[in-house]
């Protein structure tokens, strides 16, 4: 049975590519429902760390658990329990808003009935109902950002990983995006967000440790 004390646990997690060390013995833990900010400059290894934690890249050394599962041995179980949003938002520009939602719902193994029910609610929450037939490529960047995050948690994962999610958007869109993150955390989803913006750490909440 997986441990439930921490959503994410890393101990001296390291990744080397030949003589180059991309991630050097990082150690941290993340509690359930926490919004955890992972700060670092561009090229500091944040994306590499996420790839190890999501089971896409095997660590060179060290240990990590995600949702109670070993990142070396239980990658498929990890993938079933997480959501992921990349820097480029992971959306298909040539598909419509509702087609993107439906596609990811099916990828996550949801039934058509559940997808349709959740989609209707999501479109209303995002005020996207009138835009549901529009191609994603035609949407403003801030709208794409909100949609990409909503798609990443559409299957209601235990943890969602966000890799530089606020890059390239204006301060107003960034603030609105963080409101979505707060709502997800309030529903019990653990949020792991990488950023190189120091001010973004002001949005992260240490409340689960208080």
Task: List PLM regions with ranges.
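Conserved ABC ATPase "signature" region
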Residues: 102, 106, 113-131
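Hydrophobic anchor residue at the start of the ABC signature
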Residues: 149
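Catalytic Walker B motif of ABC-type/P-loop ATPase nucleotide-binding domains
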Residues: 160-163
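A short, proline-enriched helix->beta-strand linker immediately N-terminal to the Walker B motif
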Residues: 154-158
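Conserved small/polar residues in nucleotide/adenosyl-binding loops
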Residues: 203-210
